[in-house]
């Protein structure tokens, strides 16, 4: 009998738990209760306990959670106790920013390959990694055993890049192109549409302005 599928909502909450636990570690805090975590994070204590119990028993009733232990366990759950060979395809402003962001390397996402189609960029060295021609992407991915491809190209070329990554044997794709990619079921896909978040922020600003006008009118 296989493992029960973990809901997407729980998966989205786990990195937030990890982030707060990491903060507690920097403050030297050794244990914390679900109620205290609830006050910090904003989820209910029962929600936190339920999420964590999905993966096992990490706390003790009346004692709470050991911060260091829970942080390590969440790392294991998220697969952050290993390293991933990673390539970035599209080395414009976003691709360069991702390549130069040291945090990704600290948590095991080692960017060892960079690819672009621009002759003026090919051959450049960014963070000690040479930019290669996208024509060589599929062969490189297969030869080097790349785990993850990060797509930072325009929407017109994103699916072709994804196809090359899949053909080379990647296990996951982090997509920043403004398009919904099609990949096989056995390839993990996480798409980040940055403009969607900005649109949501715009809506929230507009809503608060309307609420303010309504309150002013009601007086």
PLM features per residue range, with description:
Residues 91:
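Glycine-rich Rossmann-fold phosphate-binding loop(s) that bind the pyrophosphate
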Residues 31, 35, 40-85:
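HTH-adjacent hinge/linker in prokaryotic transcriptional regulators
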Residues 1-30:
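Extreme N-terminal segment that seeds HTH/winged-HTH DNA-binding domains in transcriptional regulators
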Residues 94:
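Hydrophobic/small residue at the entry helix of a nucleotide-binding pocket
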Residues 17, 22-25, 129-219:
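Phosphate-bearing ligand-interacting subdomains
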Residues 105-127:
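NAD(P)-binding Rossmann-fold cofactor-contacting core
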């Amino acid at each position: 009998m296989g493992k029960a599928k973990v809901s997407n909502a729980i998966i989205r909450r786990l990195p937030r738990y990890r982030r707060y636990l990491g903060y507690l570690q920097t403050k030297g805090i050794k244990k914390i209760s679900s109620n205290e975590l609830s006050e910090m994070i904003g989820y209910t204590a029962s929600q936190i306990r339920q999420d964590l119990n999905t993966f096992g028993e990490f706390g003790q009733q009346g004692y709470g959670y050991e911060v260091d232990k829970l942080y390590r366990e969440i790392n294991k759950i998220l697969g952050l106790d290993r390293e991933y060979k990673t390539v970035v395809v599209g080395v414009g402003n976003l691709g360069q920013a991702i390549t130069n962001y040291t945090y990704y390397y600290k948590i095991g996402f080692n960017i060892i390959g960079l690819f672009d189609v621009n002759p003026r960029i090919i051959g450049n060295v960014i963070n000690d990694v040479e930019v290669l021609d996208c024509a060589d992407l599929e062969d490189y991915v297969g030869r080097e055993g790349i785990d993850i491809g990060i797509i930072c190209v325009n929407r017109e070329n994103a699916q072709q890049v994804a196809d090359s990554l899949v053909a080379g044997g990647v296990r996951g794709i982090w997509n920043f192109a403004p398009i919904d990619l099609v990949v096989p079921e056995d390839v993990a896909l996480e798409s980040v549409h940055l403009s969607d978040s900005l649109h949501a922020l715009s809506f929230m600003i507009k809503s608060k302005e309307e609420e303010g006008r309504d309150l002013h009118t009601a007086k």
